């Protein structure tokens, strides 16, 4: 494992990978963190994410469960059934989600809420909050309001 995980980040990465199994023991009022692995192409971000996700099932670097190119609604819905697992969302780029949309999603995620929506009849739709613990990868750092950055563990993966 030492050849895959950078030695200076290994303890943080493994701790984050095991956090979903302890998540139910935390009070409901605790905010839910997310981790973002940032690095250059070929630095091993997806390999690390698939390795950490493999604590919860079979994953490969080429088949992430979700991508930031998906709509935020899709990301939220795919993460809903993953209450006690890592939810790997690959390849963050600022062109995929504007800052306002991403900020709204991450704030709702950290509170365990869904992004509120209405039906065609203007009735409140049943929320499907993302319950998986988000492990994000990308070549750029996620930027936004300070409240978003405070909710994320941003780890730079060396080339």
Task: Report residues per predicted region.
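P-loop NTPase catalytic core of nucleic-acid-dependent motor ATPases
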Residues: 1-62
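Active-site-adjacent structural elements in folded domains
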Residues: 1-5, 63-75, 117-122
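AAA+/P-loop NTPase substrate/partner-engagement loops
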Residues: 43, 47-100
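Conserved catalytic network of the ASCE P-loop NTPase/AAA+ motor domain
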Residues: 78-81, 98, 125-130, 144-148
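Residues immediately C-terminal
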Residues: 94-95, 140-142
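Conserved catalytic/switch belt of AAA+ P-loop NTPases
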Residues: 102-121
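Structural recognition of the conserved hydrophobic beta-strand(s) that form the central parallel beta-sheet
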Residues: 115-116, 129-139, 154-156
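Conserved P-loop NTPase catalytic core
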Residues: 143-159
């Amino acid at each position: 494992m030492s050849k895959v995980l950078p030695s200076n980040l290994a303890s943080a990465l493994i701790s984050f990978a095991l956090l979903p199994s302890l998540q139910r023991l935390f009070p409901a009022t605790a905010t839910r963190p997310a981790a973002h692995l940032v690095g250059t192409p070929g630095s091993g971000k997806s390999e690390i994410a698939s390795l950490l996700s493999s604590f919860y099932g079979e994953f490969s670097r080429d088949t992430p469960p979700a991508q930031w190119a998906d709509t935020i609604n899709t990301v939220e819905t795919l993460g809903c059934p993953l209450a006690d697992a890592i939810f790997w969302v690959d390849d963050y780029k600022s062109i995929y989600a504007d800052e306002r949309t991403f900020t709204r999603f991450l704030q709702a995620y950290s509170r365990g809420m869904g992004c509120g929506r209405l039906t065609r009849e203007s009735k409140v739709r049943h929320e499907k909050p993302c319950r998986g613990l988000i492990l994000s990868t990308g070549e750029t750092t996620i930027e936004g309001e300070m409240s978003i950055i405070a909710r994320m563990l941003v780890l730079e993966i060396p080339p």
